[in-house]
A protein has these predicted regions:
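Flexible, glycine-rich surface segments
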Residues: 231, 235-318
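C-terminal motif of bacterial Sec signal peptides marking the signal peptidase cleavage site
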Residues: 16-20
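Extracytoplasmic ligand-binding site segments that recognize negatively charged/polar headgroups
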Residues: 99, 106-113, 124-135, 175-178, ...
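Bacterial N-terminal signal peptides that target proteins for export
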Residues: 1-8
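Bacterial Sec-exported substrate-binding components of ABC uptake systems
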Residues: 21-109, 220-248, 370-381
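Structured C-terminal subdomain patch of bacterial secreted/periplasmic proteins
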Residues: 198-226, 306-381
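A short, structured surface patch at a secondary-structure boundary
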Residues: 64-68, 74-160, 166-172
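Structural recognition of the beta-strand scaffold that forms the well-ordered cores
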Residues: 100-103, 120-124, 166-170, 190-194, ...
Length: 381
C-alpha cells in the first residue's frame, strides 16, 4: 500500500511540475454553468470592526473573494459551482467543501473549535503533546486528526493520502518557499493567514470571519465575534486606572524580552485600563519584541505597578523565588516588593478566541479585582 501511495505521490508531483500549480488533483464535480470573472461584481462585503489585514467580498452565486493584505487573494467557490472563466492569475481557488484541512498555523485551531468545525481538520502541523487546546489534543488521541509534519518538513505522503484540499499556514511558510510550491504541485491550495500582523488585538479574533467564509458559516462567525466584543464593553468603557504594567520574560542569555509599544499585548493592557511601561518602545524591524539587557530593563521597568511574566515562551512560574532565580536584580522592582507579580498560563498563545478573557484578566489585576476569576493569569506567591 505504501509503495502504491508513494508512486501516486511521485506521479502527482511530476504532473504538477509539468502542468503548473493546482492541476495534479481535480476539484469536486462541477455542475453549474461556467461564469466569466470579468462579468462578476461584488454585491456586498463582510463588515469589519477591528481587522485591517483582510477583507471579504461577496458575489452572486455564493462566491466570496478573500483578500489578505500584502499577500494574496482567494476565491471561495461553492460546492458543485464552476470556477469562473478568465480568473486573474494571482487568485487562488478554494473549492468547497473544505473538509480535509492541513492546519499548520496553531493559532487558528481555537477559531475552528469555536465554530464547531474541528471535523474539517484532517491533519495537524502540531503534535498531540504540543496542543494546549483540549479538543485538538483529544481529536488527535482519537485518530480524527493526524500529525503531518511541521511547516518546514511536511509529510507529503500523509497529506496526499488524506485527500487534503487546503493547507492553512502562517507567514513562517515564506522561510521555506519550496514547501509551499510542493504542496501546490500536489494540487493543494495554501492559505497564508496574517492575523499576527493585525494592529488591534481584537482584529486577531476577527479573523474568525475568514474561517466562517471558508467553511460556509459566516453568520455563526460574525455572532461569535460580536458576542466576544459585547462581553468586554464594560471594561472598554471604563476610565484608565493609571497603573503601569510590564510584560516580559527572561531569556536563556539573561536578557529581558519585552513587547514593543505597538504590539497587541501592549494594546490589550491599555484596553484593560493600564499603561504599558515601555509605551515609547518602537523600531523599524518587523519583530514585535525586543531583548533588553537587565540594566536597561531595570531602568525602564523597576517602578512598574504590575509585572506580568510571559510563560508562553519560557517555563511557567509559581513563586517569586523562581522569578528571582532568573535575575536577582528583580528583587528591587516595585511590583516584587508589593507582591503584584503575575504569570501567564502556557495555553495563552493558542487561545486566540480568548483574547477578550485576557483583557478581562489584565483589568482584574490592574484594578485589584477578584483573582479567583482569572483564567489566564495567576499570582506568584
Amino acid at each position: 500500500m505504501r509503495r502504491i501511495t508513494a508512486w501516486c505521490l511521485s506521479a502527482a508531483l511530476l504532473l504538477g511540475g509539468l502542468s503548473g500549480c493546482g492541476t495534479a488533483r481535480q476539484s469536486t464535480a462541477q455542475t453549474q454553468a461556467a461564469v466569466s470573472w470579468s462579468d462578476m461584481q461584488p454585491t456586498d462585503s463582510v463588515d469589519l470592526e477591528y481587522a485591517e489585514c483582510f477583507s471579504v467580498d461577496h458575489y452572486d452565486g455564493g462566491y466570496s473573494l478573500i483578500t489578505v493584505k500584502d499577500d494574496a487573494r482567494y476565491l471561495v467557490v461553492p460546492e458543485n459551482a464552476s470556477v469562473p472563466d478568465g480568473l486573474d492569475a494571482d487568485i487562488v481557488v478554494l473549492q468547497q467543501p473544505l473538509d480535509s484541512i492541513y492546519l499548520v498555523s496553531s493559532s487558528v485551531m481555537d477559531q475552528f473549535v469555536a465554530l464547531d468545525a474541528l471535523d474539517s481538520i484532517a491533519l495537524s502541523g502540531t503534535k498531540q503533546d504540543g496542543w494546549y487546546i483540549d479538543e485538538a489534543k483529544q481529536a488527535m488521541a482519537d485518530g480524527k486528526i493526524t500529525y503531518a509534519g511541521k511547516y518546514s518538513a511536511p509529510d507529503y505522503e500523509t497529506i496526499y493520502s488524506a485527500d487534503c484540499n487546503l493547507a492553512i499556514e502562517n507567514t513562517m511558510i515564506y522561510h521555506t518557499p519550496e514547501v509551499k510550491e510542493q504542496l501546490e504541485k500536489l494540487g493543494i491550495p495554501v492559505f497564508v493567514e496574517r492575523s499576527s500582523y493585525e494592529p488591534h488585538a481584537l482584529g486577531r479574533m476577527e479573523w474568525i470571519k475568514v474561517y466562517g467564509t471558508l467553511l460556509g458559516c459566516e453568520d455563526k462567525a460574525e455572532k461569535l465575534f460580536a458576542d466576544k466584543v459585547d462581553g468586554i464593553v464594560d471594561i472598554l468603557q471604563k476610565p484608565a486606572a493609571g497603573k503601569t504594567v510590564s510584560f516580559f520574560y527572561i531569556t536563556s542569555n539573561g536578557a529581558a524580552n519585552v513587547r514593543k509599544s505597538t504590539d497587541y499585548i501592549a494594546e490589550m493592557i491599555s484596553l484593560a485600563g493600564g499603561k504599558y511601561i515601555f509605551d515609547d518602545l518602537t523600531d523599524d524591524t518587523a519583530k514585535s519584541t525586543v531583548n533588553m539587557q537587565m540594566e536597561s530593563f531595570y531602568a525602564g521597568a523597576k517602578d512598574a505597578d504590575v509585572m506580568i511574566y510571559n510563560a508562553t515562551i519560557d517555563s511557567e512560574l509559581q513563586t517569586l523565588d523562581q522569578l528571582l532565580e532568573k535575575s536577582s536584580l528583580l528583587a528591587d522592582f516595585k511590583a516584587v516588593k508589593t507582591g503584584n507579580v503575575w504569570c501567564t498560563e502556557k495555553n495563552l498563545y493558542q487561545s486566540t478566541m480568548e483574547l477578550d478573557e485576557l483583557i478581562r484578566d489584565f483589568h482584574t489585576v490592574i484594578a485589584d479585582g477578584d483573582p479567583s476569576t482569572l483564567k489566564y493569569l495567576h499570582k506568584l506567591s
